[in-house]
A protein has these predicted regions:
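Short, well-ordered coil/turn segments that N-cap beta-strands
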Residues: 29-31, 56-58, 92-98, 153-160, ...
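N-terminal carbohydrate-binding accessory modules
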Residues: 6-59, 89, 93
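Hydrophobic or amphipathic alpha-helical targeting/insertion segments
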Residues: 82-147
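Aromatic-lined substrate-binding rim segments of carbohydrate-active enzymes
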Residues: 45-111, 182-186
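Carbohydrate-binding surfaces of carbohydrate-active enzymes
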Residues: 122, 134-149, 155-163, 174-178, ...
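Noncatalytic carbohydrate-binding groove/subsite architecture in carbohydrate-active enzymes
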Residues: 177-274
Length: 362
């Protein structure tokens, strides 16, 4: 059975999840990288997406930040850097598939995890089956999802699948809430496969998934693929699921916080770790291109009562640097793919050169 590698332009296809990922009944391995459109200027989207394709990958993944698209209650914005439709079209024109993670909570080291601040003025419990919260999500989805459903794969677009919530198993275990989010999506025309993503540990998988409702389960980790996939496989076996394995967030770097050392990861070690994932399943590199937390949208972690704000840069020590150019990590992973997965065609990446003045970039 010949594998499908890339999106065939202008041709509708069917994506299914069985014992493996299948496109039109042919086996498909997802090689995805995260590029958040809201962290990259629109004039640079093509550059970043092209470099993802040039690496040998076939899919782009992105979150959608509710607090940017509905900054005030009932006031919506899908223009400029928030034009998700234009972003997806750019990806499709390059032959890339897309994985969409459409809120309500995204984490992503983003202000309030993507939740709009005006929710705090409402009498509701966020990320729960509270009717007031679900109504707010429903109103947002009424505006958002009609922009996405025409771009589903079986409607001629490039969206393979969409996520329900985000790492909910690290927060709560309100299954009624997860089912309600799924229902809101399906009632508004989302017909593609749905999935959840959580840490691959028993407690988080039990709390954050809808495995008994046949919602596909993915895991998030940055190393030890053998161990983490084994944990997921055990969970699948317990629930009678014969699904493919996928790491939805393979952390190839890490975010940085004020007054803390910049975190770096060895390129060759990363390339080997990516190879170990691909030997068993599919991957989404988080991040492929981190970009920038524009304005005051950088998030904040906490350690006890101590706030640990992230910096403006979301470079993440990713495969592309903050401005979108290839790093040593990019070339190390590309060499690994060329050696072990030559069936995925590669190209020379684009590099943007800056003017120089007395040794400083302008």
């Amino acid at each position: 059975m010949k594998a499908v590698l890339y999106l065939r332009k202008h041709q509708m296809a069917r994506f299914k999840i069985g014992h493996s990922f299948c496109l039109d009944d042919r086996e498909f391995k997802i090689l995805s990288g995260a590029i958040h459109y809201f962290r990259v200027q629109p004039e640079d989207w093509y550059h970043s997406l092209y470099n993802l394709k040039a690496l040998g990958f076939n899919t782009v993944e992105t979150y959608l930040p509710w607090n940017m698209h509905e900054p005030q209650k009932g006031v919506f914005d899908f223009q400029g850097i928030l034009d998700i439709e234009a972003y997806l079209q750019t990806a499709q024109d390059l032959g890339l598939y897309a994985i969409i993670r459409p809120s309500p909570f995204i984490c992503a080291e983003w202000e309030f995890g993507g939740l709009p601040a005006w929710l705090l003025n409402e009498n509701m419990r966020i990320r729960s089956s509270d009717e007031a919260f679900l109504q707010a999500v429903a109103s947002y989805y009424d505006e958002l999802l009609p922009r996405l459903t025409p771009r589903l794969l079986d409607n001629g677009g490039n969206i393979l699948m969409m996520q329900v919530e985000n790492e909910y198993g690290s927060y709560g275990e309100d299954k009624a809430y997860l089912r309600a989010i799924r229902q809101l999506m399906e009632e508004r025309g989302v017909t593609c496969p749905l999935f959840t993503s959580d840490g691959p540990w028993r407690a988080t998988l039990q709390a954050g998934t809808l495995i008994d409702d046949d919602v596909f389960v993915t895991g998030n980790f940055g190393s030890k693929a053998d161990y983490n996939f084994a944990q997921m496989q055990e969970f699948f076996d317990e629930h009678g699921k014969k699904w493919p394995l996928m790491c939805m967030e393979f952390w190839d770097g890490w975010f940085n916080r004020w007054k803390e050392p910049i975190i770096k990861r060895d390129p060759d070690e990363l390339a080997q770790a990516v190879h170990e994932v691909l030997q068993q399943g599919s991957i989404n590199l988080y991040m492929f291109h981190g970009g920038t937390n524009f304005g005051f949208m950088n998030g904040c972690s906490a350690r006890g009562v101590i706030d640990l704000p992230q910096v403006t840069s979301y470079d993440y020590d990713a495969l592309l640097d903050e401005r979108g150019n290839p790093t040593d990590k990019y070339h190390a992973v590309q060499r690994m793919l060329k050696e072990h997965y030559p069936e995925y065609p590669q190209m020379e990446p684009l590099v943007e050169y800056s003017a120089q003045s007395e040794g400083q970039s302008l």
